[in-house]
Amino acid sequence: MDKLLDRFFNYVSFDTQAKANVKSVPSTQGQRKLAQALQQELLTLGFSHVTLSDHGCVMATLPANVSWPVPTIGFIAHLDTSPDFSGKNVNPQIVENYRGGDIALGIGDEVLSPVMFPVLHQLLGHTLITTDGKTLLGADDKAGIAEIITAMVRLKHRNVPHGDIRIAFTPDEEVGKGAQFFNVAEFDAQWAYTVDGGGIGELEFENFNAASVAIKIVGNNVHPGSAKGVMVNALSLATRYHQELPVDETPECTEGYDGFYHLQSIKGTVERAEMHYIVRDFNRDSFEARKKNMVDIAKRVGKGLHRDCYIEIVIDDSYYNMREQIIKHPHIIELAQQAMLDCDITPIMKPIRGGTDGAQLSFKGLPCPNIFTGGYNYHGKHEFITLEGMEKAVAVIMRISELTAKRAKEL
């Protein structure tokens, strides 16, 4: 079996499911166990400057093998899997030379069907790695880890010219904390790529601007039989608030570069209600306008209330569109595009309707677009990846490294 697959199967055997609303990083012990295993593997493979931080971030260096100065670049993947679905006792299935039709996932009724997932029609003849229908696969992002390490080993063994390359494996990306304790100064790269995308050719450097919005509504409860002019129903105010937002600017009505408002939770009584929203937009001005709109609605709905009744709104920015940072360094994208073309891959540029560690790192001074892993249907039992896609990702990582060295020699 290919060493790339060996590595991947080893990593998915670790249960690294992240846990939301946990203060510690990493949020689960399984992530630390995988980090320790990777630290040991990297030392055994002869990497230099191998470190493991208190927060479970592994870093290492593949030293340059050329005599001329080359910018230090980096490749980053994450240790954790989604909190949305179990990552315990992952049992991958290999489907060689896929011939079309449904793929049975383990023993039972679960199938991976081209009717539900038409991308399978494009993968005839490929080797697919699927789940057994009971867990997610963990290609997001253990495929990225396997691809990065395999690419580094091949660069070294094949003596492909390259500068210093830094690699890092981070915890808790799935719960938004991956970049929180990432030491950019210690990583010491001029730019990097997260290997955390989907199908072959994906190259992403645009993501949402993101904010979370918490709304607290305090009403006044009295006996409904004598409530006229006295009762203030917090639930009614919550309903009025939500109805003020545009009905067609929600996740289920938007795509591409559209932004949205998303009500994630609502709970309450007559006396008190709480609402939690997220706000997303690619354009910074539109993003700011959305947040202002939410404040303005709170003012309108809360106007004229008794002084003991009120609407309180707290808005926290989560992350911003990394495009603002990356367009200042166009060669980072150009190198990745050229690397893909050199590997007979058509780059697919599309916005990320979400966020990545790279978005936060880009604003910490480490420009960091995202490249593909070769995986599909993340965060659930229908997750799968192709061996061909994984090999292509390895080839692109190697080619980016080589082109960076060539570019430095020519400058």
Swiss-Prot record:
Single GO molecular function: tripeptide aminopeptidase activity
Cofactor names: Zn(2+)
Cofactor note: Binds 2 Zn(2+) ions per subunit.
Membrane-spanning ranges: none
ATP-binding as UniProt keyword: no
Residue positions of the active site: D80, E173
Entry protein name: Peptidase T
Origin species: Yersinia pseudotuberculosis serotype O:1b (strain IP 31758)
